[in-house]
A protein has these predicted regions:
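Intracellular coupling helices
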Residues: 264-304
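Mid-to-C-terminal secondary-structure elements
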Residues: 45-51, 55-239
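Selective detector of the "anchor" transmembrane alpha-helix that sits immediately C-terminal
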Residues: 250-271
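Membrane-proximal extracellular/periplasmic loop immediately following the first transmembrane helix
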Residues: 2-77, 81-82
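Small-residue-rich transmembrane alpha-helices
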Residues: 301-347
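C-terminal membrane-exit region of the final transmembrane helix in multipass inner-membrane proteins
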Residues: 1, 270, 276, 339-347
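Membrane-helix entry/capping segments
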Residues: 218-255, 276, 321-341
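N-terminal signal-anchor/signal peptide hydrophobic helix marking the start
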Residues: 1, 250-253, 301-303
Length: 347
């Protein structure tokens, strides 16, 4: 997948209403952002927390995403946008292509330097640079003009799949990580749109939510902000992939039902029908048919049925593999010779 969500959580903080007893009137979004940084700092100092990050609309298995574009010479490159603080790489353990791990990625992400997935330009054949050649390039973002903002490509990560049902080369695996500044946070208008992600240390995951909630009112209510909810990323993944999993299970049930009917058909043809045709076979031999002729006749039927069976099995296996790999449309409707052969046999 290119990331690790084990022992990770996403927290959201909301602003109190004026009816709350602890509400402080007159506080601005800038002050709310400062309060949120204080909360993040307190979370990071918990002995059971390994790393804490801020992000906007880019947690794994998110139902939405931000877009981004920059230029390689004159070629526009479009991808997903990871709007994050550096610790995001440590929370989800992204991997640097040079093998140095997530710490080097966190150090590379700055307001003037972005981090890209190594495959971000692979689909752009006209691009002058690909893969490792992108490192160190300074490129214009959004507009290919001299006065446009320019960012340096400071590091490259391994490709990151969007979920288990998209291919590694899908659009969702190509992203640009851009530094999430305080000005950008303030522009969101509400802290509820900001994701606070954290990783719990090994062996500390059991009961973590209960321990955090106990401390929430005392330590993590700052200014007008309070902890709205905390969700394990494993639950986010389950909710996001439920429809795809259900669809896949339905397809497997259909394939199983089809194969079961084929199996029963084979049993009926090769066993019961043969038993009922013993008198016919004896009559044909009495009229001059040889064993070779009988074998050819029955063998032809066997080959047709076996061909149908193996074609169905091949289609089912290919369908399952391609569906989970993310290339359902191309494979199932364009590439499947076995499927075409199966329908030709039926009609």
């Amino acid at each position: 997948m290119g990331f690790d969500i084990e022992n990770t959580y996403v927290l959201r903080f909301e602003r109190m209403t004026s009816k709350a007893a602890a509400y402080q009137p007159g506080r601005t979004m800038k002050e709310d952002v400062a309060d949120l940084h204080e909360i993040v700092n307190r979370l990071a100092h918990r002995p059971d927390v390994e790393a804490v990050s801020l992000s906007q609309n880019c947690i794994p298995y998110n139902d939405g995403a931000n877009s981004f574009s920059f230029y390689l010479d004159t070629v526009p490159v479009r991808s997903l946008k990871r709007w994050i603080t550096p610790e995001y790489f440590n929370v989800f353990r992204y991997r640097n292509i040079d093998g140095s791990g997530s710490e080097s990625l966190a150090e590379a992400l700055t307001p003037s330097g972005m981090v890209l997935s190594v495959n971000i330009a692979d689909v752009y054949q006209d691009a002058p640079w690909h893969g490792k050649e992108l490192l160190g390039r300074r490129v214009p973002v959004w507009r290919n003009e001299p006065e446009a903002e320019h960012l340096s490509i400071a590091a490259l990560t391994e490709p990151v799949r969007y979920d288990h049902f998209t291919a590694p080369d899908d659009y969702g695996s190509r992203y640009a990580a851009v530094y999430l500044t305080d000005e950008a946070l303030e522009s969101l208008g509400e802290t509820v749109y900001i994701e606070v992600c954290l990783r719990v240390r090994e062996g500390q995951n059991d009961g973590f939510i209960d321990r955090l909630i106990v401390d929430a009112d005392r330590q993590y209510q700052v200014g007008n902000l309070y902890l709205l909810d905390i969700t394990p990323l494993s639950d986010v993944r389950t909710a996001y992939e439920t429809d795809s999993v259900n669809e896949l299970n339905t397809q497997f049930c259909i394939i199983f039902f089809l194969l079961l009917n084929i199996f029963l058909g084979i049993i009926g043809t090769f066993w019961f029908r043969t038993q009922h045709r013993r008198a016919e076979i004896a009559l044909r031999m009495a009229l001059g048919s040889t064993l070779g002729n009988l074998r050819s006749s029955d063998g032809g039927r066997s080959l047709v049925i076996a061909d149908i069976c193996y074609s169905c099995i091949g289609c089912g296996v290919e369908f399952g593999i391609c569906r989970t790999g993310g290339s359902y449309t191309y494979a199932f409707y364009g590439r499947s010779f076995l499927r075409l052969r199966f329908w030709a046999l039926l009609f």
